[in-house]
Structures are given as structure tokens and as C-alpha cells.
UniProtKB/Swiss-Prot annotation:
This is Nuclear pore complex protein GP210. It comes from the Eukaryota. Pfam families: Ig_GP210_15th (PF24425), Ig_GP210_16th (PF24427), Ig_NUP210_1st (PF22967), Ig_NUP210_2nd (PF22969), Ig_NUP210_7th (PF22962). The gene is GB210. One of its GO terms (biological process) is protein transport. The lineage of its organism: Eukaryota, Viridiplantae, Streptophyta, Embryophyta, Tracheophyta. It comes from Arabidopsis thaliana (Mouse-ear cress).
Amino acid sequence: MVPVSFCFFFLLLLLSAGESSSQLVSGPHITDVNILLPPKMKNPVEYRLQGSDGCFKWSWDHHDILSVTPEFNSSSHCSTSARLRSISPYSGRKETAVYATDIQTGMVIRCKVFIDNFSRIQIFHNSIKLDLDGLSMLRVRAFDNEDNEFSSLVGLQFIWKLMPESGGSTHHLAHVPLKESPLTDCGGLCGYLDIQKKLEDSGVFADLFVVKGTKIGHEKVSVHLLEAPLTHIADEIVLTVAEAMSLEPRSPVYVLMGASFGYTLKVMRGNVPQAVDLPSPHHRWSVLNSSVAQVDSLIGLTKALSLGVTTVVVEDTRVAGHIQGSSINVVTPDTLILYISPWSMSGDLITESKPFPSSMHWYVVSGRQYLIQMKIFSGRPDAHEIYITETDDIKLYGKDSDYWKIVSLPDELSSEYGQRNSRILNAISPGLGELTSTLTYFSGHQESKEVLKVVQEIRVCEKVQFTLNSEDDTPKVLLPWTPAVYQEMELIVTGGCAKASSDYKWFTSDISILSVSAYGIIQAKRPGIATVKVVSTFDSQNFDEVIVEVSIPSSMVMLQNFPVETVVGSHLKAAVTMKALNGATFSRCDAFNSLIKWKTGSESFVIVNATSEMMMLDELRSMDSSPPCSRASIYTASTGRTVLQATLAKEFHYFDKSLSESIDLKATLTIGAYLPLSVRQDSDGNHHGGYWFDKAQEETDFGVSKLYLVPGTYVDVMLLGGPERWDDNVEFTETVKTLYEDEEDLTSRVNVHHEVDRRANMYRISCQKLGSYKLVFLRGNLLGIDHPVPAVAEALLSVHCSLPSSVVLIVDEPVNKLDVIRAASQADRAPGRLRVTPVTVANGQIIRVAAVGISEFGEAFSNSSTLSLRWELTSCNNLAYWDDDYNSKMTKSGWERFLALRNESGLCTVRATVSGIDYSFKSQYSTLLPQGSESTLTDAVRLQLVSTLRVTPEFNLVFFNPNAKVNLSMTGGSCLWEAVVNNSRVAEVIRPPSGLQCSQMMLSPKGLGTTIVTVYDIGVSPPLSALALIKVADVDWIKIASGDEISIMEGSTHSIDLLTGIDDGMTFDSSQYSLMDIMVHIEDDLVEHVTVDEDSLSVGEHVATSSFKIAARRLGITTLYVSARQQSGGKVLSQTIKVEVYSPPRLHPQGIFLVPGASYVLTIEGGPTMNVSVDYTTVDNEVAKIEKSGRLYATSPGNTTIYATIYGSEGAVICQAIGNAEVGLPATAMLVAQSDTVAVGHEMPVSPSFPEGDLLSFYELCSAYKWTIEDEKVLIFIASSINVEENAGFVNVVQGRSAGKTRVTIAFSCDFVSPGLYSESRTYEASMILSVVPDLPLSLGAPMTWVLPPFYTSSGLLPSSSEPQKHRDGQSHRGNIVYSILKDCSSRADFERDTISINGGSVKTTDSNNVACIQAKDRTSGRIEIAACVRVAEVAQIRMKSEGIPFHVIDLAVGGELELPINYYDTLGIPFLEAHGVTTYNVETNHRDVVFIKTVNDQPSAYIKGIKHGKALIRVSIGDNLRKSDYVLVSVGAHIFPQNPVIHTGNLLNFSITGADNEVTGQWFTSNRSVISVNVASGQAKAISQGSTHVTFKGHGLKLQTKVTVLFGNTIYVDSPGETLTNVHVPAEGYKFPVKFRENKFAVTEHGNKATFNCQVDPPFIGYTKPWMDLDTGNTYCLFFPYSPEHLVHSMSITKDMKPHVSFSVDASLKEARRVSGSASALLIGGFSVTGPDKLNINPDSNTTIISLVGNTDVQIHCRNKGRLSISLIKRDDFGIAGHAQYKVNVLRSEQFTDRIIITLPATGQIVEIDVCYDTGESLVASSKDGYSVLLKILWGVLVLVVSVIILMKVIDRQVPTGATGTATYSGNAAQGTPERRSGTVIYHEESPRTPSPFMEYVKRTVDETPYYRREGRRRFNPQNTM
């Protein structure tokens, strides 16, 4: 153990030592610690002493000889440098010191300053030789007599002179002014150039002098001081000017032995290198070692003689000693390497490409040129390139090849690249070949030579090229992009000798714009232009590039490749493409396929497979169309036209905050559908020997393809369906074509006449001659605008002109139907065409008898009127006769007659025979009818006259129940009948009672199924029969037919209709409902089921009819469903409907006063809310106008009535609310305050008002508020919200200063303007007198006095123990602290009356104006103190005040939420400690469309939420007393987030814009970059140094600003707890967020104790926090208490995008310095709660129940035995952490059991178990036995517990004295004397307020001022363990 401890201690020492050393290194610094300055002179000398890493305060010793001027940075808060200047004349050498004190760390740095006179000066320079046209900087330095250099000469005046050395007049140097020189002083940080330039401008010189070389030679430079009496001090130097020389080739030069080459000499003239022509008269050449090389002295020609190193020197003879040299190395070669580089067609080397050596594979591109260089190297491993001369033997082979050609360099480039060692390769075609190069050289002796050889393989490849789909192959790709949509496109590339996709490398110039995969698939990332580059892996120079532009789609158009109309029942194809802003079409855009939404304006056109029509893509490509972005197939269900619309809508700011745009593209196309073109017969042949058709039936149900006409007749036909005329821009065609076989003119045989005058689609077809013809009708639209494909339909019609081959008679039919004609023509006939089977008809009526012509094919003629008929009756004398009168009235044709039947039975024969041609056609068609045709053109039928039997109803649906009965009625026939059922297992016939045998028949159901009841009338011959269908079924469904949502006014009733039926849709008769056991099930008692006869309560009563009534009892929304019992015992349930009970609607406000030009948003309180709409109207629009949103605009003075009408979903009026509005001009104004008095030091808001209204009525129209106070010694304005520009000065706050009365006055002007209707301006002035009540002369108890309302019981304000809660003894219910009320014992009445009393930890009050003090006694120590005093007062004032709302103005972002705390004050403006539920308050605003207000019962806060941009005034008042009101102006709009942050140095903070309508773009700025820096584009800020500054955002029409405070270091640290945070099963002490402090001036008080701090949670709606300190450990925490799920459901603003978890932060800040703060973030996972009992008791009468959950509904629910219970979700409102769900529990088995339902939340592990008990009532004995056993177990457990408690109490009593002995002493330095605490039990209320800070200050001050009070062993603590 000891070694471990020693190691640990040693480690701590090392760490502390490391920290100390790091602090020494990182402290503040200054630039100099010793400074030498001259004394005061005519021109003062200044020196800047620069500091760093600190903020300094400057001081110095001798203020008479030295002046120190601090310099501050741009924020003027910190000094980092100071200017030093001597201020005393010279009187000997002096010494002083300057001290730089870092105000942050307190570190002091001392700088010694010496002041002495000059002894000498000296010119300092870097070189005495300078180049021609070059610059040189000369500087004067001064020294004292000890040769110490002076620190600065800036400010002194000097005289500089230039003089040729030889004494001539030609100067070799020229002076360059400082302002024209390139010198800088770094902005004053590295020099004093500004002062030196000013000296030169004034005509003298400074200590700095710049010269320029102008001519080769020597120049004298002299300087002397221009300061009396030191003008004799001077200095002089000589400078040399020469030309700068350079040699080529550059030194060092490596050559082979025997090489010969010449140098090129260049000189700098005018800063431009120029070659010198050799030989030159001014230059001579020489070599240092002539055995290695020799050089020509005039022209510089050099030859290498032997291996070695030497130097060639060239000298300028004009300047002595001016030479330039070049090193020559004569070497032997080691390697020969070939290099290849791309060569441009213009003859230039592509410099950005790197040459490839022969050690690599060479790949070249066909069609390109390359530079091949042969290079020789020597000296491994540090190889040096050898300079190749003309004498070197180097060769290149392989010049001629099928794949390339090699040529020499042009002459003008040979000098640059080398004629001998460079070639140009022209690649011709792909292939593989070789190049060979050799070098022959001397190996060291002139006699022997050696050869170097290199062979290089070259492959010629095709150029890498993109293959684009565009027609011109323009190397540009255009891709669309929107957030979260990344369009992809595969790029096709060829060339590069590639064999696989891996032989290419892909690059993109900007990966943030475009990404590219290894397979060439590009993906758009954001808008912009990027270049995609594909490179061959073999040759990096073989590449291709394509420009890819990514842009946001600007428009969307339909592709014009498909028909726009088609036949009903088929499909239309459509496709869209998108275009960029410039109109260019995107190369590919199919990634938007799923985002583009298709819809039509009609339900007749159905979108099918809008995103998967891939076949259409191939069709579009084959059409050479633009690439489609989305495709759709539209099914045409019915005719008509509609607009097909494709939309692409997307918001940007949800994905990227930097984007402010949104995309909303639409493309429309008119499409249509038409019925198939058909021909319909329009003229009726019913009266003319033809068939009948129903003109009234649907046009699509009847068409004709064949017509049979007798010559001379006609028929009208109509074209049905087909395309309608599209529009005027599209040609419409409608024609008829005739097809025939022979060449005869058709017009003589059949005539088609278009009936234009009647209807455009009507044709008359007349038959002229015999024959068969075919007509083709064409109708449709051709090509045109918006009609790209023709749509022409056709219909065929065959016309047969012939004579009938037979005729048939139609008997007792109102018309000649085709089916009747067909049946009659196919009937059996006897000779003479007499129909064998008689036709039975009922007697006693007039029947119609008609004849129809039949063709040889058995088809009925359409018209046979050319032929005439003869009618005959046989054996009908007593039975029937022709009714000529009736016949003449009903018809004029001979092809139909009317026969009157007598009331007799028997047989009668009717015959019709064609007798010839009608007289009107005889002249033209007399020869049509052949001779002898009468024998075939005849028909006869026998009529059987009888009475008819009928059974009604013919169908009956019967509920399967033994008690059900079916009654059938019979009419006609005789009374002798027999009934037979074909399935006796379904139903049986019951004989009716006596007297009803002839008219009724009864059936009873026996089983499920269908049966036919046949009734035979045996009284007629032959017997007649009638049929009825009976279906016996069980009920399959029951439905509420009154709708799924019903709204009922409170107190009224509503009737609900029912339907029952079976699966095929048939319904039961209401008479059978009583057999179905129909029950009504209502969720709760909001509504009740009442009987039809009376409004008595009958919940759960059976319904025996098809409707029932419900009565509305309470407000709210509930659900209702009905059930019916099947014969099998099962139940069928109807749909669940919502029933809303609403209160009578009321217009809010019901009466309102406004001034002209003002507006107010009215709302409806009460009324229905489900599927309703509200329409607002005013009676007089000249007085006020109102919008649909309810916004009322006052226009001109007057009165009007406002109606708010509520409509249902079908447009029916449900209810109406009425209000009134008065518009007027107030004559006077008044000033309003909530009280006439205010206490000294307290505040009260005041505002103007009118007698007829308040601020809500006029504040928007008034401005120029001017507030004055008559006597500012009595009152002052402390926090004015006046802002003239924003017209927000209507509220001010006054504070009492001293006793007295004074007048407060306001003046303002109002512009009552209603555009175009009313305009007037007025000025108002109002005042009031306020009294200021002074404090009492002695009121030390005022700060510790709690103000409470009368007759009030507070929360647990009085803690009963001083111990932390976790240390309290859980077994003791007695606290350590005892409280009592101090009373006046002299008055017995006052003593006995408890005006203020204590109840547990609460304080109870009675009457007002009572004061009492509470005494606290610690029973363990015996200490007695005054805990607090209580004053009882009436609530007189109300405020919306908090630290976040100091000036009655709030800035709120759109969607942002804020809690407005509501506080109460007495008549003097003193706040109440508590006043929960004492009075009611009302919160109102004039613009509810701008802000949403929500108040929660029993919570002293109002919650507001920004809805849209604008301003709204919020008023809070006590009840309806408008004088007791406070106002807050809310401005909803865009804001910088976060607002007014406080961060610490070195930290980062991301600013953003919230609450904007659209995503905004702009730039960020900071007003002080030394405090904080901010990224201009992103808004990311970094804290640099301590201070305050402003961050500004500037966008399009938007400028926002916020203040930023930067603190030095983190002073408060807040950590998050490690456990999972949820709002269910919260620890009793809450969740602990540890708070740690850094020991600095912000966090430590003068006595060393931790300062108090505040805690706050954001967002506030999820819970609350309070600070807490553990007195044992000294640790501090923010305790977080989340609200329960029930609280969140009722208090939160519900939105659909809420999640089951909420991210929140806990902030801690110092009370003394709120800027010093810290925060920690955490995640709260919502839990759930089950509303209702924890045990479900179910019985057979109600075998279902509902389980309701609130909170997080992402739960798993199951039971142990799934065979007994079924659990199903019936409703779920998924609102995240505040959701709501309902589950239905059904019992599946009718047997007694118990089970358990388990509900689990996987996110938190929360489990809730619910016991289920199903009791059938069958067994009571067993349950009683079980109950006895359980009771015995409980009694036994209680007995054991009681005995254990008794034993434990005795043990505790014995231990108490021991612990109490140590409670009397306190020792500050001995831990052994610390007493053992006795714990008491304290229950803290969750909303217990803190002890007021004034009271705590009073306690501290009392302790500090108490004489002889020992503080050593005491520590201050809060009795409530709170800060």
C-alpha cells in the first residue's frame, strides 16, 4: 500500500511541475526589457514597446523624464503596446523603469529605460556593392560613449548627401523617396515608416535612406544629424555599382571528356537579362585549372581535357573585382535515359506534364506529338545530368515505324531543348514498337571508347474520348439537383488501350458538386460546374474531360410524343422532362421519377404505375426525344377532358440551411377521353314495322351495326362518341365514306344526308333501290398545337335495302323490343303462319298489337312503312274488338293496332297480312312487291284471355331468426292457389289466417340459404304461376349511415340512422332490426343514448328501429359505434364514428372598438371543429371589412354587425355567431396604470388608452410617443421600450425614487388612414398623477418578508430539517426544525386569533393587511432565529415580466415557442411570493394569425408560438378588468440563433437564421475581429479574446444583429448524467446535472464560498430545474424534473412532426454575473402512462374494454394467453412524446380466467402490467376459498411487520442519547467535533420556490454585523439545500 501511495504522490508532483512550467512559457511577453533613448530634443524620438499574450496596464517610475502613452486595440478595452518618449533635456545619463502589468493574470514585467546623449552615428548597410538599377536600404544607427546602440531614432532629422568618388559630376546613385519604394512597416507593427515618410515630405531626411544604382562606378554617401547642438555628428561610406552577370549553361556544368562548348554571357539591363555579344571589350575569360579544361579568353569557348573539376571565370574590366564563375565537372557517364513529354502542335512543351523516363512503360496517343529527350547521368546515387554538346556521339534508332514518325526539332527550338539529344515523335496509329538510343564516349583515356545503350517499348493508343448521346457530341453534360436528390449518369468512354473498366481513372474537379465512381457513374451533389476527367491508367496524359453543370431545375415541360386523347377504357402515356434556367434540357433526370407527382383534375382519369413505366423509356429513346424525368400511364375511366399535371415541389431549408430557395415546378397537358365512335338509330321504327329503341337510355348502351330498310323508307342515325373538337388551333374532321361492290352510282341506291340544321352528329339514311352497302363514319382531330398526334375514330354501318321475308306479330307489348321480336319470330307456327302457342293476356284491357318486318336472316327491319297491312280478327266476337277511336288517337300507322279485350276468358285469333304498297309510294315502288307474296308476308296469333296472378314482393331478404316472419301479397288470378318452395330447409309456407287466403301468404325461415316460392293459380286453365325469391341470411355488417363525424351542440339531441345487410350489398328491412339485438356503445359520458319518446337516460339500451337518438351532455369529442348480434352468437360491429359536442359558437371578441385603419383578428370560441369552414361577413362594408381569415379592418366611423357562419362539409349551415364592431375617433386619451401608488424602488408599467378601447384598438396607427415626468426626483423611467422607428413606445415603466406625488405625461400622434376610404390625423396628450410611498424609517425586515394573498395556503415553504434529503432518517416522521408564529401576548384577542398560521410546511393566511413573523427553532442545537415574516395583501397588479422580457418587446422566430411568466403584485408594486389560483387572468392578442397563445390551468404562465411573420400585441389582465393589464409586443420574423450568446475564448459557435419564410442567403460580419472571428459564408464563429462585439447578417432585404460576449476561459462546467433520462419513474431528487466552477473572479466571492447560481432548461415545456448543493461533499447540481406524460399531453402544442424523444439543454449561470454560464445537452426519451385502473374486470355482459395510453406510444403490448384475449389497436395519434393510443381488449372464450396484459417500451425498458379478470359468475365457492387464503396471508404479513417495527423502535430509542451528546460543540479545525446529524423527513413540493435572495442577504448581513460572533467553524448554507 505504501509504494502505491508514494507513486501516486510522485505522479502528482510531476503533473504540478508540468503545469507550472507550461504556465511560465505561456504567460504574457514584451518585446524589450532594456531600452536606450535620447533626451528631449527639438524633434521627439518615440519607441513602441510591444506586448503580447496579455492585456496590460502600464506604469513607470519617473514621470518627469519619461512619458508612456498606452495604445489600445480596436475594441478600446485592451492595451498591448505603449509609446515611450523622453521628456526631459539632457542633464546626464538617467535610468528609469516601465512596468507592464497583465490585468488578467496579475503578472508584472519590468523594462529598464536608459536616457543618454549621442556619441556617434554610423550608416548600416547589407552590401557595399549593388546592381545596376538595383535598390539598397541605408539606415543610421546611433551609439553612446559606451557604444550602446540607441533603441530608436525615429523622428530625428538627418541630412543625406551623394557624391561621385572621383569628384566628377556624374552620379552613380540616385535617391529613391520612401513613398515610392516597396518598403512597408506592417501597418505600424514592424516599423515607423509613416513618420519617416512625413520627414521626407517636409524637406528633410529620416534615419532611413533608399538609393538606386544608375551608372557603373563608385559613389560616396554621407549623413549628419540635423539636431542642435549635435550637427557635428556624421558618417560616410562608399558604394559600388556594377552590372549583374550570369552564365549559361548554369553552374555547375557536367560534361564528358573531350566535349567542347561555348558559354553565353548575360547581363541585367533595365531588370531584363540581355546576352552580351562575344568577344566583348569589357569582359575577359579564364580557367582556374587548365589541366582539366581550357577556355578562350575572348569568346569563352571551353573544352574538357581530362577528368576533374575546375572553374571558368569571366571578369568585368570596368569594375575592379567584379567577376562571375561557373564550375565545370568532367565526368564519365553512368546511365543513359530516354524521357518522353507531351508536345503541343504549336511547338511548345506542355510544362504541366512530367516527363516519363525509359524505366517506365510508354503509352502515347494516336494523333499527338511528343518530345523525346536523351539524357546522360553521372555519379550514383546522387546522379547529375551531363550537358550534351555537339561533339558528343549520341544516336537514336527506330525512327521509322508503322505506328509513329520521328522528326528533328525546329531550328528555333534546338537551343532550348538541345539539337543533339531531342526529337519529336508523331504518333500515327495504334500499335506496339521499340526505340533504341546509344552513347559512345571516352572511358578515361582518349584512346578507348565505351557504349551505353537503352531500348524503350512504345505503345500507341487511341485517344480517350467520351461518347455522349447528344447529336453534336458537345462535351458538356447537364444534370439536375435538389436537396436529397442526387441524379446519376453513366459516362461512356473509349480509347486509352483499355481492356476493362479498371483501366480508367476518374476524377472530378469539385467533389462537393459532382462525384464520380470507379466505373464512370457521376452523381450530382449540389449546384455548380465541375469537370469530369477520365484518365487512362497507362498514360496520365491520355485523358478526356467533360464539363458537367449541375443546376436546380427551372422549368418542367411535357414531352410531345404521345396522343393526348384516346378511347375510354384504354391508357394514355405521358412523360415530362426538366430544363435549366437557360432552357437547356438535362442529359438525364430519372432520379426525380419518384418525386414528380402526377395528378389529374378529374376522377375519370386515374394515374396508374406513374413511376414504373420503364417500357416507355425505350419508346422515348427510339423517338429521339428529350430524356424523360418521369413517366405516367393514365387510365381513362370515362369521357371528358382534364388537365394532367406533373409537379415537383421541394423545400431546401429542411436539408441545407444555407439554401433559401424552394423548387416548385409544374407541367400541364390537356388530355381527353372519348367513347368509341358508334352509330345509334335515332328515329323510332316502333310505329312503322320496325323495332323500338330507348332514346332515354345511356348513349353507350345502344349502337347499331346493321340497318334493314324497305325501299322508300329512311332512318335517322346519330354518331355517338368519338373525339370532340379540340380547339380552334386543331383541324377537326367529320366525314362519311361509302363502300360498295359494283360501279353503279351509289347515290341512286342509298342516300346519306347530314342533318346540319338539327344536330351536327345527325345523319338521315334513306333507301332508294335494292342492294347492300357499307358506310364508314370518320370523326376526330388532326395535328395542331397541344395536339401532337392525330386522333380519328371510325364506325362502320351496313345498310340493306330489301323486302321482308316475313312478318311477326307483337302482342301486349308497349313497344317493339328486339328481344320480344326475336322470341316471336322463333316461335313454332302451324300452316298459315299461325303461332302454335297461344299468348295469354289479362282480360278487361286494351292491348297493343303490332307487326314487324323480318329479313331473310331473321333480323328485324328498322322501317317497313312503304308496305301496307291488312288486320283480321277470328273468333273474337264476344272477346275482343278493334277500338278505332283509341287507335286513331294513339297511332297513324297501319303497322300497329289497339285491341279492346272484354272481361271474358277464351281464345281469339289476330292476323296481319302485307296487302301491297302504301298509296303514297305506289308511283315509285309499285313493282317492288312480287306476285304471290301475301302467303309469306302474314302472321297470326291466338290470344288466351285470362286474369293475371302476381306475388309481391318478388324478392325478400330475411334475417335468420325463428321469430322472423315474411308476408307475401297476391293479386289477380283466382282464389285457388298452391305454394311450393324448392328448398324446404330454408323456409316453409304458413297458411294465413282465415279471411286472408286469397291475398296473403306467410313464410317462416328455417335455415340459411335461398329458395324460390312458386304460387300456382289452379283456378284458370291452363294454370298460371307467379314466383318470389326468398333469401335467409345472417347479418354480416351493420353501418352507421349518418356519417363518420357528427357535431352536436351541448344540450341538444341528434338522430343517427342505421343500415344492416349482408356481404353482397343487400340490406334488411327495418322491421327485422328488433331481432338483431342492436346495442349502442359510447366511449364516455359526453353523449348519452336516449329513447325516442322521452329524454330519459337509457345508456346501453337496445335499438329496435333503424335510427336512435343521442343527447349531448358535456363538451368534448368521443367515439361511438353500434353492434348487432348474429344468430350464431357472434357480434358484428359498425365503424367507429367521432361525435363532437360543442358549445354554442361565440364571436371573440363579441364587441370590439377600433379606430379607422386598425385591424383585429376575430376568432370563433366554441362551435364545431370537424370538417367545417367559417365564413365571416359584415353588414356594412363601409364601416369595416373582414377577410376569410377573420381579420377585421376598420375603414370609417360607424357601427356594423359581424356574422360568422359555420358550414359543414356539404355546404350546409350548421350554426352562426354574431358580434358587433364600432369604429370611431376618440376625442381624448388617458394614461392608465394598474395602481395610483408605487413604493420606492419598485416599478409599474404605464400606457395610454382611449375611453372606448385600449391599446389593442389603436397602437398600430400611433407613433411619436413622448414621455415626461414632472418631478424626476419622485419618479423616473427605468426601462423604456420607446423606439420611434418601430412605433413601440406605447408602454413605459416608472420606478419610485422618493416620497411624493408627480405627474406623468405622454403625447403622441395617430394617423387614422384607411386607403381610399378615410384619412385623418390627430394628436393626443394624457397624464395622471402617481404617488410614491416611502419605506418606513426602520424596515430591516422588509427584504425577508414574504407577501402572500389572503385566505391562502402556500406550498411547503418551511423545511423541517437542515439535512440533505438523502441523509434523512426514513423511519422518523419528525423534523429537526420547529416553526411558530410570533404573537403579541398583551392582547388576548390578537393572541387567540390566527390571522396567519402554520400548517405543516405551509403558511395559511386569512384577512388582508396582517403581518406576522415566523420563528424557527432547531431542536438538536436549541438555536432560535427569525425564519421569515409574512405580510398579507390583496392582488392588485399583474405583469408579464422575466429576465428574458425586460422591455415589453419580444423577438420570436417563426415556429419558435416562448413561455411568458405571469407575476402578481400588490398595490405598491411589491411582488407576491406565491399566488397560485388566487385570481383568474385573461390573455388576449389582436393578431392570432401571427402568434398562438395557450394557457394551462393552474399554471402562472402563458405559452406563445410564432405562426407567421408580423407583429402582435399581447395583453394580460386580471379577469376582464382592462385597467389591470400589462402588454408585450411580439415581433415574429427571422432572427439570428442563438440570440446574445455568451461563449468562452477558443470555443466555436455556429450562427444560423431561424424563422424566415424561405431559406435566406447572405454574409456574416463581426464588428470586432479581435474579439470574435466569423466565417462570412457559413456563420461559424470563433472566440478570440475577451470582450463584447456584434455579429451581423446581411442578406437580400434583410439585416439582423446580435450581441456576443466572450469570456476568458470556461468558468462553469455542466455535465450530463450517464443514465437514460425519461419522464416516468423519475428519481425523487430528479436527474442530477453536475455543475463545476472554475476559481476566478466570476465564480468566487470575497469569503471564498461558491457563488449562487441559477438553473434553466430549454425547451421549458418538457420540465423544470432547480439548483441544489450537497452540503456533505460540496458538490453542486442542477436537478432536472421532467413533466409526466399526462402533463405533456395537456400542455404541449401538438404537431405531427414530433418525435418520441426530445433533445434539451440544462443551463447554469451565476446570479452575480449571468454572462458566466455553462450548459450540457441531453436526450429525454418519453415514457408512457396508462389512464385507468390497473386491473380490468370483464364479464359476459361487456366482453370488451378499452386501454388508453398517453405519452410515447411506440410500445409493445401482449398478453400471456393469446387464446383467451385479443388486443388490437383502434386509434393512435402519433405525436411523439405527447402521443395518445387506444387498444381494444376482446374476450375470445366464454370461460372464467385471469390473465395479465404486459405493455413494454423498448426504448427505455419501461414495463406496465395490467391484471385481467373475466368472471362468468359460475363459480363462487372456489373464489371464496382463494379469497380466504389470500386474507390469511395478508394478516400474517401485517403481524410480522408490526413486530419488526416495535423491535426497531426500541433499538433506536436506546441509541438516541449517544448521538445527542456531541451536538453542543463546533470546532473549526477538528473534524472529530463535527456532530452527528439527526435526519428529519422533509417532503419538498416540486414547485417549491427558493428562499428570496433579499432574505438571504439579510441573514448574511445580520451574521456579519453581530459582535463577537465566531465565524471560524461556521459555514453558510441554505435551509432548503437550494442555491
